[in-house]
Each structure stands twice: as structure tokens, then as C-alpha cells.
Swiss-Prot record:
GO biological process, one term: fatty acid biosynthetic process
Residues annotated as binding NADP(+): 14-17, 64-65, 91, 156-160, 189
Enzyme class: oxidoreductase
Gene responsible for this protein: fabG
Pfam families, A to Z: adh_short_C2
Protein name: 3-oxoacyl-[acyl-carrier-protein] reductase FabG
Function: Catalyzes the NADPH-dependent reduction of beta-ketoacyl-ACP substrates to beta-hydroxyacyl-ACP products, the first reductive step in the elongation cycle of fatty acid biosynthesis.
Family the entry assigns: Belongs to the short-chain dehydrogenases/reductases (SDR) family.
Self-association and partners: Homotetramer.
Species of origin: Chlamydia pneumoniae
Residues the entry annotates as binding substrate: 143
Keywords for the protein's UniProt record, in alphabetical order: Fatty acid biosynthesis, Fatty acid metabolism, Lipid biosynthesis, Lipid metabolism, NADP, Oxidoreductase
This enzyme's EC code(s): 1.1.1.100
Record-linked InterPro entries: 3oxo_ACP_reduc (IPR011284), NAD(P)-bd_dom_sf (IPR036291), Sc_DH/Rdtase_CS (IPR020904), SDR_fam (IPR002347)
Catalytic activity of the protein: a (3R)-hydroxyacyl-[ACP] + NADP(+) = a 3-oxoacyl-[ACP] + NADPH + H(+)
Length: 248
């Protein structure tokens, strides 16, 4: 038994940058064929050009995961092409930070729709095919914010906490069909999402991390690879924290 993903067909939502891109790269290097879902087609095509030749086949589909119709259509197109889906990584996410008293309803709804409701759309679209195959791995990307909270992020924290609960519940529904559903909870990871934070806030975060550094997308991707592979074949309904010891 090893960590290879040769022959596996994979969808990674939000896979054109940050943690998602790190996961896509590592999966390709380990032999998987990966379709990236995102909104920015120009960025997606540039990413494909940079990743071609890494190992598996890579493609891009423009998908708004907050709309069920588009998700269903793209899952069907993926199945028409590959005839199966082995691994789904739900990584797409946005932030619309503000104190609750100043947060607009649109800021609340857009984060919940993209970060949480999208899992209902993607998972409900692929799960029947995984059930038929009696095989599959779903990896949902949450955040340590779900566990510790974050001022100014009630919408984001609520969505990420919902992902953890969703993961546990879906895992119990489909375990008998040999489908595993697990979750990642990254901490402070150097991505374009965290690059906008001011230096003082970054410094405070780093002081709280026992390992003394921010994480990288590759740090998270290696754990995702473990969950996608047969090395974790007896794991489901779990949330693996990747935060350098911040929430020990």
C-alpha cells in the first residue's frame, strides 16, 4: 500500500490558488487526473499551463459553486469525460469580514453560500456515483477559526464550523458504501487570503504558533494527499488540524 493516486479522477474546487493550488500540484505529481473548479477563467488557464507535465492530466472548468445548476452540469460533464469520480476536494471559499453589527446581509449570505452551501451542491451531485462505485474520498477544507472563533468573521467561522459538522454527518451516511469523508482545518497559512493582513496582526499570529512559522499550502496539501490515498483507508469523519500547534 502506498500514497500513489495514479488513475484517480479528482475535482478540486477553488483549486487555482492558495491551498487549493497546493493540493492540485501534489495530486498531479502523484499521478491523479485533476479538474480545477474556479471562477476566474484567465487565471485557471494560466495555472493549467504552469502545471502541465507534472504527472496527471489537469483541466479547468468555470464553476460558481454557490449555484446548484452549474455544479450539477459540471459534475455530469466530468463523468461524461472520465466515467467516474474518485476524489472530491471542497476547498472553494471567500471572506467578507466585518463586525456583526456592521455586516450586511449580502456579506453573510455570500460567505455561507460559497463556503458551506456549496458542499451540499457538490457532495449531493457526486455521492450517488461514489455509492454506485462503492468507493470514494471527500475532503472538505474548514479552518481552525471553526474551533477558536475570530472577531470580525462570524460568517466565515459559522460556515467553517458547519463544514466540520457536515463532514461528520455525511461520513456516517456513506461509510457503509466504502466512501470516506474527512476534513482539514488549516491554521495560519501563507496565501493571498492572508497576505492582506497587516504586519502587526501577522506578528501576533506567529507568536501564538509553537512551531514558530506560518504554514504553507504544501503543508496542507501533504495532509490532503494522505486523506485521499489508501494510507488513510480506515479514517472517516475526522478533522485533521494543520496549524503548527496553535490550537493544541
Amino acid at each position: 500500500m502506498d500514497i500513489t493516486l495514479v488513475g484517480k479522477k479528482v475535482i478540486v474546487t477553488g483549486g487555482s490558488r492558495g491551498i487549493g493550488l497546493g493540493i492540485v500540484k501534489l495530486f498531479l505529481e502523484n499521478g491523479a487526473d485533476v479538474e480545477i473548479w474556479g471562477l476566474n477563467e484567465e487565471r485557471g488557464q494560466a495555472v493549467i499551463e504552469s502545471l502541465t507535465g507534472l504527472g496527471g492530466e489537469v483541466s479547468f472548468a468555470r464553476v460558481d459553486v454557490s449555484h446548484n445548476g452549474g455544479v450539477k452540469d459540471c459534475v455530469q460533464k466530468f463523468l461524461d469525460k472520465h466515467n467516474k469520480i474518485d476524489i472530491l476536494v471542497n476547498n472553494a471559499g471567500i471572506t467578507r469580514d466585518n463586525l456583526l453589527m456592521r455586516m450586511s446581509e449580502d456579506d453573510w449570505q455570500s460567505v455561507i453560500s460559497t463556503n458551506l452551501t456549496s458542499l451540499y451542491y457538490t457532495c449531493s451531485s457526486v455521492i450517488r456515483h461514489m455509492i454506485k462505485a462503492r468507493s470514494g474520498s471527500i475532503i472538505n477544507v474548514a479552518s481552525i477559526v471553526a474551533k477558536i472563533g475570530s472577531a470580525g468573521q462570524t460568517n466565515y467561522a459559522a460556515a467553517k464550523a458547519g463544514i466540520i459538522a457536515f463532514t461528520k454527518s455525511l461520513a456516517k451516511e456513506v461509510a457503509a458504501r466504502n466512501i470516506r469523508v474527512n476534513c482539514l482545518a488549516p491554521g495560519f497559512i501563507e496565501t493571498d487570503m492572508t497576505s492582506v493582513l497587516n504586519d502587526n496582526l501577522k506578528a501576533e499570529w506567529l507568536k501564538s504558533i509553537p512551531l514558530g512559522r506560518a504554514g504553507t499550502p504544501e503543508d496542507v496539501a501533504r495532509v490532503a494527499l494522505f486523506l485521499a490515498s489508501q494510507l488513510s483507508s480506515y479514517m472517516t469523519a475526522q478533522t485533521l488540524v494543520v496549524d503548527g500547534g496553535l490550537t493544541y
